[in-house]
Amino acid sequence: MTLEKIIEKLAAKSSILISPITVKENLAYKVEPNFLLPFLKALKESEELRFTVLTDLFGSDFPEKAKRFEVVYNLLSLKLNKRLIIKTYVSEHESIPSAMSIFNATCWYEREVYDMFGINFDGNDDKRRILTDYEFEGHPLRKDFPLTGYTQVKYDEQTKKVAYEPVNLDIEYREFDFSSPWHSPTYTLPGDEKAK
């Protein structure tokens, strides 16, 4: 029996709805958030599969979709020497159940996804920032987060403290909207006339 058939049989046995998806040459499945934990647990505890290692957990933002956030779990079976990708999708105001009860390494991954995207994981109450500063506003990997951010951090020599100030750009913001890296824009930017 193929690996795909074993996984689909395991999901059907537990009444878990999964959909196979294509992610290059990798074996991958899409699952709704309410089926995520039962599916991860079944994959880990199955004697045939033994997907016991969570190698990565990350998020992506697709603001044009109703469920804009994609959360991806990469699993490894040392027994089979196979990898498996599990994807789930949530909207901005939904949360995902935390997988901390299944994989010990999940806490830091979930903190990173929360820090970068603002995706909440039910059952993980540790909302401390892990990559950004504690006073940081927003979630920087969201597509609607401004490129320059909201504040800049500087060390103030007079007060001998870190100071948060509004962003002040010393140069004018330029729009790079080339249709291709091989074509120049059709308009003239200030200063370009000197090159002619």
From Swiss-Prot:
Q: What InterPro entries would the database entry show?
A: NADH_DH_suC, NADH_quin_OxRdtase_su_C/D-like, NADH_UbQ_OxRdtase_30kDa_su
- Gene Ontology molecular-function annotations: NADH dehydrogenase (ubiquinone) activity; NADH:ubiquinone reductase (non-electrogenic) activity; quinone binding
List its EC numbers.
7.1.1.-
Q: Which UniProt keywords apply?
A: Cell inner membrane, Cell membrane, Membrane, NAD, Quinone, Translocase, Transport, Ubiquinone
Any one GO CC term of this protein is: plasma membrane
Coiled-coil annotated residue ranges, if any: none
Answer yes or no on keyword Transmembrane: no
Membrane disposition: Peripheral membrane protein
The highest taxon in the source lineage is Bacteria
Subcellular location per the Swiss-Prot or TrEMBL entry: Cell inner membrane
Catalytically driven reaction(s):
a quinone + NADH + 5 H(+)(in) = a quinol + NAD(+) + 4 H(+)(out)
Quaternary arrangement and interactors, per the entry? Answer: NDH-1 is composed of 14 different subunits. Subunits NuoB, C, D, E, F, and G constitute the peripheral sector of the complex.
Give the family from UniProt: Belongs to the complex I 30 kDa subunit family.
NCBIfam families reported for this sequence? NuoC_fam (TIGR01961), PRK06074.1-3 (NF004731), PRK06074.1-5 (NF004733)
Purpose of the protein = NDH-1 shuttles electrons from NADH, via FMN and iron-sulfur (Fe-S) centers, to quinones in the respiratory chain. The immediate electron acceptor for the enzyme in this species is believed to be ubiquinone. Couples the redox reaction to proton translocation (for every two electrons transferred, four hydrogen ions are translocated across the cytoplasmic membrane), and thus conserves the redox energy in a proton gradient.
Q: What is this protein called?
A: NADH-quinone oxidoreductase subunit C
Protein species of origin = Rickettsia bellii (strain RML369-C)
